[in-house]
Amino acid sequence: MSGPIVLGIESTCDETAASVVQGRILISNVVASSMDEHARYGGVIPEIASRAHAEAFVPCVSKALADANMTLSDVDAIAVSAGPGLAGCLAVGVSGAKSLAWAANKPIYGINHVIGHIAVTQLQFGPFPEDTLALIVSGGHTSLLHVEDVARHIDVVGTTLDDAAGECFDKVARLLGFPYPGGPHIDRHAQLGDPHAIKVPQGLTQGKAGQQHPYDFSFSGVKTAVARWIEEQQAQGNEIPVDDVCASLADSVATVLAKKAMRGCEQYDSKTLIVGGGFSANSQLRAKLLEVGAEHGVEVRVPQLKLCTDNGAMVAMLGVNLVEAGVAPSNPDFAIDSAMPLTKISM
């Protein structure tokens, strides 16, 4: 094996994670989730998540190093998610990573969590071809990005104007009575339903709005339309066809994401589309992207499920890219940025 060895630490939301990556090889990957603690509240509670990070930080990092048969002295650098994310959660991971870097006299990189979702695909697919586009879909982000240089230059092609795809799913899931997180439940029911049973709008794909925002995303109207349909059926005393609702919603969202992504690939003459973020685990989206990618001659790189959701490997992999590119480490007293812009790759 060759290449820099980087310890990656993740704590942006409800997963505490640590990983060791050497070059393009994943050596260890440890994730501790506090998801079950948030389920009864129907969403992530920042205070609970922060406390869970504090409890899981040392065990996660220790296990990641032990699984890699390494100590801190063996790593070349430490990378940690500095944003975007929940401020209290970020603070736990960043303060812990800074302490480790100071104690071991190692350089530290405060990285952009979202760009990490792009970088991690290299572990499965290798280097990025020229003019690669990336579709990042998660609970808080839906963005189309042009990857000129993952360590130095990312351009935003399109982004969400209101609800992200994951938010839309979670809100509809609550209406259907699914426990948190709702996305996997919608995915499961959608596989049993008719995707054409209910007419669900496809935001910003037609008319003047579609022309003005060819690469941007809007899912609040989708959520509202589905909610109204459910309310109308309930008012009439009709039983809700849950499988059909889920299938129609999933098909609408997947179609919009695929259309916009392919339009972006045409604009940038890109033959490679990277897909990342927790929502990229959705089976309807994965199938739709692979289908339209084949039709357009675009290679769609969808990572294995364990690399879709938040993890330390994505942080470590971006750290490797930064070290290899000769990017200067972050200042030891860098601050977290809960609203870190997508064009800022590291602090």
Protein language model annotation of sequence segments:
Residues 3-84, 117:
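N-terminal beta-alpha supersecondary unit
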Residues 110-111, 290-315, 328:
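Conserved phosphate-binding/catalytic loops in two-lobed NTP-binding clefts
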Residues 15-21, 134-136, 142-146:
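Short beta-strand scaffold segments in enzyme catalytic cores
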Residues 72-82, 269-279, 301:
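Short glycine-rich phosphate-binding loop at a beta-alpha junction
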Residues 126, 149-194, 223-224, 228-234:
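Glycine-rich phosphate-binding loop plus the immediately following alpha-helix
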Residues 29, 71, 188-273, 284-296, ...:
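A contiguous, well-structured pocket-lining segment that forms one wall/lid of small-molecule binding clefts
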